[in-house]
Amino acid sequence: MVINQKNLSSPVAPYDKSGSQSSTKADIPSINYTVDHSFQKRETSGKELSEATPQVTQSLSNQLILTTLNDLYNWARLSSLWPLLYGTSCCFIEFASLLGSRFDFDRFGLVPRSSPRQADLIITAGTVTMKMAPSLVRLYEQMPEPKYVIAMGACTITGGMFSTDSYSTVRGVDKLIPVDVYLPGCPPKPEAIIDAVIKLRKKVAQEDFVERNNFRQIHRYYSISHEFKSSSTVHTGKYLQSSERKSPPKELSEATGIPIQFILKNTQKTEIQP
């Protein structure tokens, strides 16, 4: 498009007595527009085309970040793991000390949440009982995908000292929910919790966005079931209603020389006057 401008240096129209600018048709500068529709085709050789292509220089590479959507997605998730506050025993005391300024686990992007709807990491700190097992499974199912589990402490992993003869302890939380990182100890130190979080971050960084459903753990009930042996009841409660339980034995009265049975009978018959 070619624009020809003429008479642009003409004087400005004078003002009248009222202050408005008086203008006539002859005073307005005329502008003529002529459009050139002819396109010239030129042949570009291979040498000229290579010179026109921008080259990646050192200054340009320092200003650009080249990555994939998969790496960006994993980086965003591993930098903002929000754990659910779930503690059932003494291991949670060590996890609570991690919240302080000495260890400062906020530098890893961990924000503790009290709602499973807003958390993507649950750290089972402490012993899991059979009455607590349905609640734990419900909390895990309410967490949005993708979600991760860290089993903290010996009682959570194998039952700990309650694994031998306890009737109410779950022998391993992996019977209920899938576990990503096992953290042994009784209880583990806050430094060990940080190391477990770092290992979980490395696992998240290696995941694939497209094939993440293929690596989901579905075998939850992996460990062996409880093996109990039935035996006769030791205490039935009937011994509390026996006559020997209500009255002291004869040997006690003979040893002390005091007729205890006679005194107890008299005290039961006497009435306290108001």
From Swiss-Prot:
It comes from the Eukaryota. The gene is ndhK. NDH shuttles electrons from NAD(P)H:plastoquinone, via FMN and iron-sulfur (Fe-S) centers, to quinones in the photosynthetic chain and possibly in a chloroplast respiratory chain. The immediate electron acceptor for the enzyme in this species is believed to be plastoquinone. Couples the redox reaction to proton translocation, and thus conserves the redox energy in a proton gradient. It comes from Chlorokybus atmophyticus (Soil alga). Transmembrane segments: none annotated. Belongs to the complex I 20 kDa subunit family. Its EC number is 7.1.1.-. One of its GO terms (biological process) is electron transport coupled proton transport. GO terms for molecular function: 4 iron, 4 sulfur cluster binding; iron ion binding; NADH dehydrogenase (ubiquinone) activity; quinone binding. This is NAD(P)H-quinone oxidoreductase subunit K, chloroplastic. The keyword Protein biosynthesis does not apply. Residues 1-10, 18-27 have a biased composition (Polar residues). Keywords: 4Fe-4S, Chloroplast, Iron, Iron-sulfur, Membrane, Metal-binding, NAD, NADP, Plastid, Plastoquinone, Quinone, Thylakoid, Translocase, Transport.
